[in-house]
């Protein structure tokens, strides 16, 4: 009987110990769970705080950048205006020397002149026409430098400009010559302008050998014509 009572008391003690241990285990688990949940809540709060703080930081950076750009632009504008140099505006420039036979290079824009005096080669006396023809011949001879450089557009421009004056002036001179001298001078003039046309074609074709050939013929024809002019 005594042994049975003792065994029952031992079982009760063991069961209480087991219950207390289970309670302790459950309590520790609950504490750990609560700690974990609290930690996760704190972590979430920290992340939200960081997100809220990053927005004003970026806005502050953008504002600082705009202010710096404004200051730099203002200093640049000040420097530009500081370097501005005033330009004095006066009256029109004096008439400059123009082509032979014109009073000045602005003659075509002189609205006080008649159209025939502004846009056409002005007629000269035979003596003045002969002098201008010699000047035009010199300019034609000077195209040799452009031929050597193969500057073909310049060769064509000078040839056509000077040849137009030369043809006009030679016709003036021929018309004043005696009848027995007119035909020979006309023949020399026709040969001269044929060689000038050949030289112009060589320049248009960009052929150096042909340009050299017809340039020599042009110079020879010019000398023959100028010798007749006196």
From Swiss-Prot:
Phosphotyrosine, modified sites: 215
Gene name as annotated: PSBQ2
Cellular component terms per the entry's GO annotation: apoplast; chloroplast; chloroplast stroma; chloroplast thylakoid; chloroplast thylakoid membrane; cytosol; extrinsic component of membrane; photosystem II oxygen evolving complex
Protein known as: Oxygen-evolving enhancer protein 3-2, chloroplastic
Organism: Arabidopsis thaliana (Mouse-ear cress)
Membrane topology: Peripheral membrane protein
Domain of life: Eukaryota
InterPro entries the UniProt entry points to: PsbQ-like_dom_sf (IPR023222), PSII_PsbQ (IPR008797), PSII_PsbQ_pln (IPR054099)
Locations listed in the record: Plastid, Chloroplast thylakoid membrane
SUPFAM superfamilies: Oxygen-evolving enhancer protein 3
GO molecular function, one term: calcium ion binding
Phosphoserine: residues carrying this PTM: 125, 216
Alphabetically ordered keywords of this record: Chloroplast, Membrane, Phosphoprotein, Photosynthesis, Photosystem II, Plastid, Thylakoid, Transit peptide
Coiled-coil regions listed: none
Keyword Nucleotide-binding: no
Keyword Phosphoprotein listed: yes
Pfam family, one: PsbQ
GO terms for biological process, alphabetical: photosynthesis
Cysteine-cysteine disulfides: none
Physiological role: Required for photosystem II assembly/stability and photoautotrophic growth under low light conditions.
Modified residue annotations for Phosphothreonine: 195, 218
Span of the transit peptide along the chain: 1-49, 50-82
Similarity annotation: Belongs to the PsbQ family.
